[in-house]
Amino acid sequence: QTLRALFQYKPQNIDELMINAGDLIYVNPAQQSDASEGWVIGTSHRTKSEKEPNVKLNGEAHNLSMSRSATNALSLQNAALRRAVLVMRHGERVDQVFGRSWLQQCLTADGKYYRADLNFPSSLPRQKDGMKQFECDPPLSCCGIFQSRLIGEALLDQEVTVSYVYSSPALRCVQTAQHVLQGLKLNPKVRIRVEPGLFEWTKWEASRAIPNFMTTAELLEASYNIDTSYRAHFPLSSLVPTESYEDYVSRSSAVIKQITSACPSKAPLPPFFAFPGVPGVILIVAHSSSLASLTRPLAGLPSRDSRDFAQMVRKIPSLGMCFCEEQKEENKWQMVNPPVKTLTHGANTAFDWRNTILGD
């Protein structure tokens, strides 16, 4: 097994090796699990041989023994190389801030879009059916775009390797995925797979109809990094309005199973990754309901009661995350802490200087 050192380690004893950040170390996984007091035997990549049991140190052959701190650093990298799923809610929507009538606030008399507040996006992508479709498929606010990019930058800081990205067809989810990838500096290297099966529980759609989502062609025209070769597991036509809770749970369980099956543990990753052929994180950008409906079946947990589910979903903020790691030895997935911290901020209400300062 190949591990990468996250930190430098200077030898304290003659049988220890100088390790620099980024060095590759070859270790036997069985020896890792049997390590005593944090010590593990491995082979430095400088030997140019994965099978050589000893390493050259100051002209002499020695077994490589690392202190607990160095071992912990390598074990962190080892954990990062496990196949994992990061389920994320989209960023802040414009209608969350400005209400359902947000579009009426920023359309001129002749139907042209203008930015009525700095938290409105500077422009809207073009749709063949016109602006009206955005009422049922709202975009991110400018703060939502910032939130998404900030999360991507945080994932980059933690050296999280994202190898696949899936998104609900909702525009806010596609936009979130796009800006997370920009923060990760993976755009356009990793493309977004739009999966209609990831859409939220359709019972919650106020219009009592499935929104007319932007087509792949429209998303590409708007410069979204879409994987055109991807074939969805659930076509848009399979989404029905006012589906039952049981049907939604069944759909979510099926789609997460299909996604993880389509992303093998030894994926042929592009050459820009530090470890070609090793597993990475499957990023899924969807809705607040997705955090439970996707991760619970993956972790082998039963679905929640529909009333408890509805109450729980209301507590999930923009960019809320759940993280599952595959435990190969036990052939199961386990929910663990996400690789980055939560994003918390306060409200910033509209300000009218005339009414506030002059009292008019």
Describe each region flagged by the PLM:
Residues Q1-R4, Q12-D23, D34-E37, A80-R82, ...:
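Eukaryote-biased feature marking scaffold/signaling PDZ-domain proteins and nuclear chromatin regulators
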Residues G130-P139, S223-D247:
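Short glycine/proline- and acidic residue-enriched helix-loop micro-motifs
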Residues K10, I14, L24-Q32, S36, ...:
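Short amphipathic alpha-helices and their capping/turn residues within compact interaction modules
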Residues T161-P169, R193, A267-P276, V281-V285:
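Short glycine-rich phosphate-binding loop at a beta-alpha junction
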Residues Q1-S65, S69:
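Src homology 3 (SH3)-mediated interaction modules
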Residues Y9, R68, L76-K189, V249-S252:
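Active-site-proximal alpha-helix that buttresses catalytic centers in soluble enzyme cores
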Residues A5, I19-V27, V40-G42, V85-H90, ...:
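Structural signal for hydrophobic/aromatic residues that build the beta-strand cores
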Residues L57-A84, V94-L103, E200-E218, S265-K266, ...:
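Acidic, low-complexity terminal tails and accessory targeting/binding regions
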